């Protein structure tokens, strides 16, 4: 798959890939204010505890922490942890809601990207990993590193 030169990753949620098995991914727009956009472009956002909920036929992103913009006045700055509306098609919202309600899955943001001037969230439909799964993944990564080291030394 070719890398699109118009897409730039602003914030990445590496922890989500460690704690969850990602089954599907979606791209969604986010409803943001001006100071939030400036802060995200500066890389001052945290996706660590963020998740999506579905209410009244809409998708909302909770616990996405976007730090207040430094040079904006205190009056016009945003609340760092407010709920943000996700912009998805109706059929995508219905599909995601069905997956979350029936199978016990959750929707977590994987990264925020800048796509042709618009900030988008890459969402993942995820199932939580157990502790032994996490340990297994760590062991596999270590063996891969050792194999690569051995091949590199030859």
Swiss-Prot record:
Q: Which GO terms describe its molecular function?
A: RNA binding
Which Gene3D superfamilies does the entry link to? 2.40.280.10
Q: Which GO terms describe its cellular component?
A: cytosol
Q: Which UniProt keywords apply?
A: Cytoplasm, RNA-binding
Could you tell me the superkingdom of the organism this chain comes from?
Bacteria
Fetch the InterPro entries from UniProt. Answer: SmpB, SsrA-bd_prot, SsrA-bd_prot_CS
- Grouped into one coarse class, the protein's main location is cytoplasm
Localization (cell): Cytoplasm
Name the Gene Ontology biological process terms: trans-translation
Chain residue ranges for the region called Disordered? 134-154
Statement: the UniProt record of this protein carries the keyword Cytoplasm: yes
**NCBIfam families registered for this protein in UniProt:** PRK05422.1, smpB
**What PANTHER family is this protein classified in?**
SSRA-BINDING PROTEIN (PTHR30308:SF2), TMRNA-BINDING COMPONENT OF TRANS-TRANSLATION TAGGING COMPLEX (PTHR30308)
- Can you tell me which family this protein belongs to? Belongs to the SmpB family.
Q: Which HAMAP family match?
A: SmpB
Q: What role does this protein play?
A: Required for rescue of stalled ribosomes mediated by trans-translation. Binds to transfer-messenger RNA (tmRNA), required for stable association of tmRNA with ribosomes. tmRNA and SmpB together mimic tRNA shape, replacing the anticodon stem-loop with SmpB. tmRNA is encoded by the ssrA gene; the 2 termini fold to resemble tRNA(Ala) and it encodes a 'tag peptide', a short internal open reading frame. During trans-translation Ala-aminoacylated tmRNA acts like a tRNA, entering the A-site of stalled ribosomes, displacing the stalled mRNA.
Name of the protein:
SsrA-binding protein
Query: Top-down, what is the taxonomic lineage of the species of origin?
Result: Bacteria, Bacillati, Cyanobacteriota, Cyanophyceae, Synechococcales
